[in-house]
From Swiss-Prot:
GO terms for molecular function: 3'-tRNA processing endoribonuclease activity; ribonuclease P activity; tRNA binding. Its EC number is 3.1.26.5. InterPro entries: Ribosomal_Su5_D2-typ_SF, Ribsml_uS5_D2-typ_fold_subgr, RNase_P, RNase_P_CS. One of its GO terms (cellular component) is ribonuclease P complex. Consists of a catalytic RNA component (M1 or rnpB) and a protein subunit. It is an enzyme of class 3 (hydrolase). The keyword Hydrolase applies. This is Ribonuclease P protein component. It catalyses: Endonucleolytic cleavage of RNA, removing 5'-extranucleotides from tRNA precursor.
Length: 123
């Protein structure tokens, strides 16, 4: 994912947390805030409690890959931050994708293209 699609500055993170709305499931929390740009931007947060640097970076790479694959179905004009919760480090890629897309659907950031995919429900 290109750098202009990422939230990088602390000021931007703070604004999203303070002024944005949050949505969550058991594995992820998503904060979102509308922006005036013509594209979405995403920030990632993975706590040190989830594991060592290798584990945290693997989680971030997987999240970026899932978002890259869903890029065409994500709404524009929104900044959002994905926070990984405890337990996400034990998930495989498919289960992580299912959980992340579920919380993005809750927040209405992700909209299914032609409706060919079945609805997924996560505990």
């Amino acid at each position: 994912m290109k750098k202009n699609f990422r939230v990088k500055r602390e000021k931007d993170f703070k604004a999203i947390f303070k002024e944005g709305t949050s949505f969550a499931n058991r594995k992820f929390v998503v904060y979102q805030l509308e922006n005036q740009k013509n594209r979405f931007r995403v920030g990632l947060s993975v706590s040190k409690k989830l594991g060592n640097a290798v584990t945290r970076n693997q989680i971030k790479r997987r999240i970026r890959h899932i978002i890259q694959n869903a890029k065409g179905s994500l709404v524009e004009d929104v900044d959002f931050v994905v926070i990984a919760r405890k337990g996400v480090e034990t998930l495989g890629y498919a289960e992580m994708e299912k959980n992340l897309l579920h919380v993005l659907k809750l927040s209405k950031i992700y909209r299914e293209g032609n409706g060919s995919e079945k609805e997924t429900k996560v505990d």
